Amino acid sequence: MPGPPFLCGETVDLHTVVEADAEFIARGRNDPEVRPWLPRSRPHTVSEAREDVEGYMSDDSDGLGLLACVDGDPVGLVSMFMVEADSGRAFIGAWFVPEAQGEGYGTDAVGRLVGYGFDERRLNRIGAAARADNDASRATLEKLGFVQEGRHREHYYVESEYVGQITYGLLESEWRVD
């Protein structure tokens, strides 16, 4: 069972992670339909997921990991990482289990995290990246106003081939335009 809600969206709530969430995180990251989209070629163990959870729960980290939940059940994870408070910038990432994909949860969850970053963390810039062939992730970022800033050719090695990466950025002033 996830921790209490931290941010509430229209379709998903973003809950704090607790130790018991490590199994969901490992299972989700290893799912055959999720894993190819993540920058990792080997299994993600429950032990590694526990370390991730400890990092999310730590007071020493400026980063943040939250479970995206629908009716209290976890359907994915959104995170803010590489936070540089002095420079006002961070990166975000997200993944969702297959049965939750295509329902708008990603747009709602990532949008809530972006709003939190700009409103409460006083960030000026949020970056993100997606595989060049990940149309769903790219559409989510673009729908939220992220601007394509670069392309890294043959950045990932996935399923016996190299695939590019698209990098995105969103400035606080661009977020406020809406």
Located regions from the model:
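Sparse recognition of residues in long alpha-helices and their boundaries
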Residues: 41-42, 65, 157
